[in-house]
Amino acid sequence: MPRRPIIRRALAALAAASLLAPALPTAAHATQNWPLKPIRIIVPNPPAGPSDIAIRPLAAAVQKALGQPVIVENRAGANGNIGAAEVARAAADGYTWLWAMDPVLTVNKHIYKNIGYSSDAIVVLNAAARFSQTLICNPKLGFKSVKDMIDATKTRELTYATGGAGSPGHLVMESLLSTTGVKMVHIPYKGPAPAMQDLMGGQVDCGFLAAPTVLPQIQSGRVTALATSGKQRSTLMPQLPTIAESGYPEFDGTFWLFLAAPKGVPADIQKRFLEAMEVAIRSPEQQDRVKPVDIEMVGSTADLAQQKAKELSGKWEALTRKIQLKAE
């Protein structure tokens, strides 16, 4: 076969390929120019709650740093599973992120038969903030300390209220009962407001609830605060001891707010987003904004966040197995 026709065909193929090349942007080109459109942060809780209050100024700061809108979208329901599932199914392109309390990612997979997604489809990237629960009791009981409550369980049946099965208040109370070897009867409610109402009314004895929910009632004397669950004292109630300071030094009922993403977000996109978020997290302005909801901004590397998530998952799995906790 003559060589000249072969050469002509090869040159024609090369020319065609060169014409097509500009129309086929590479993955590297797409990540280099990120973000090209608005970014979503999914919050699997209702608006105006502590986690929602914490993320909105962060989103505004990241929006300013990256030059694209950063939109907070609330997707409440099923103890956070609905919002988490939306993130798990999203494209791993850096345009969808998750901001969630740690039980959404560290507890739900152990207590729900089906959370609606594969738990390894979401990757934790920043342990952004921590918060605690406050142990309160009806003042008519006369308890002045955690020890008073624990001692009372040995002579009478006590009840405790929570915002629902698997909620932070439920987990931390069962953790305390496990630590002390005593029992109380769990009365779950559909949210903290009705739990607080019945506790004040004397229909239930005690409970663990978030500080912003309980502070006005503590100040009015309608409930008595005994301790806070975390290792650090509450910024809202610094006079209140921790449970660790109340005779149980190993106890730690700290909860976390995690920033996470669908598995597979390119490393350079992760880096840009996380750097902008970390600057916002560590700003004094952000610390001041979240103090009224008793959240402490911390921030972390991705490795440390994943280590923390793994540690908490193991801790809560052991507890939920022990108390045979299952959610519908």
Task: Describe every region a protein language model picked out.
Residues W99-V104, N108, P192, L209-V214, ...:
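Beta->alpha turn/N-cap motifs
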Residues H29-A121, E157-T159, A165, G181-D205, ...:
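N-terminal (or domain-start) structured segment
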Residues R89-Y95, H110-P194, I243, W256-R289:
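Hinge/capping helix and adjacent helix->loop/strand transition within the periplasmic-binding protein
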Residues A12-A23:
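Bacterial N-terminal signal peptides
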Residues S118, R130, V214-S283, E311-G314, ...:
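C-terminal lobe and pocket-closing loops
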Residues M1-I6:
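N-terminal secretory signal peptides that target proteins for export/translocation
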Residues L36-P38, A267-E328:
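An extracytoplasmic/periplasmic, membrane-proximal ligand-sensing/linker region
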